[in-house]
């Protein structure tokens, strides 16, 4: 038998869920990499730390050189950053022919990355949505991406798996999203 609380007291209740910290609900700013190139070094090191087991990400200097190409302003690749004030949160890019073995697939969403401390805030979703808006603005008919493990996330937004294949030492799903027409 459990004892009733003394008169004037209420039984202990589960604590109410605390609201998200203010920084978790502030708008996420997406800017072209060209507007904040000072983040290239931080981004290159973060990508290397996360993906260094895979060939494109094994060398910080090559990563920096890739992002320097995104600054040229002559078509793709184009990259965007998610920032909070002066702090880098993540990145995404539009590029051509991301998997050389698949030359028939021209336009790709790639390099979608959120720094560990910014995960769970919707940063990746905002980056992808922004990249899709830019792809539509550019008139791209369709986009492809590859992922080893988050197919379900992209499927919720209309991406369809078209094949699985080995790439950079892992099995990935190649996915497609039609943007214009019936490509």
Language-model-derived ranges and their functions:
Residues 2, 19-26:
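Short, often N-terminal, low-complexity regions
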Residues 27-43:
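A short beta-loop-alpha structural element at the N-terminal edge
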Residues 42, 141, 145-151, 163-183:
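C-terminal "cap" of GNAT-fold acetyltransferases
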Residues 45-69:
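Conserved GNAT-fold acetyl-CoA-binding loop/helix
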Residues 70-75:
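Short loop/turn motifs at secondary-structure junctions and domain boundaries
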Residues 79-81, 87-97, 108, 113:
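Conserved beta-strand in the GNAT
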Residues 111-114, 120-133:
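Conserved acetyl-CoA-binding loop-helix of GNAT-fold acetyltransferases
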Residues 154, 159:
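Conserved active-site tyrosine of GNAT-family acetyltransferases
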């Amino acid at each position: 038998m459990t004892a009733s609380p003394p008169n004037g007291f209420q039984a202990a209740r589960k604590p109410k869920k605390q609201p998200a910290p203010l920084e978790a609900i502030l708008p996420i700013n997406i800017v072209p990499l060209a507007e904040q190139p000072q983040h290239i070094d931080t981004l290159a090191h973060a990508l290397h730390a996360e993906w260094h087991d895979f060939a494109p990400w094994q060398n910080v200097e090559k990563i920096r050189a890739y992002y320097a190409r995104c600054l040229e302003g002559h078509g793709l690749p184009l990259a965007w950053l998610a920032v909070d004030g002066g702090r880098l949160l993540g990145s995404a890019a539009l590029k051509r022919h991301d998997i050389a073995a698949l030359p028939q697939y021209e336009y790709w969403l790639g390099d979608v990355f959120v720094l560990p401390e910014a995960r769970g805030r919707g940063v990746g979703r905002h980056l992808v949505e922004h990249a899709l808006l830019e792809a539509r603005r550019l008139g791209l008919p369709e986009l492809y991406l590859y992922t080893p493990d988050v197919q379900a996330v992209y499927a919720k937004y209309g991406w369809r798996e078209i094949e699985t294949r080995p790439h950079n030492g892992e099995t990935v799903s190649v996915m497609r999203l039609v943007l214009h027409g019936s490509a």
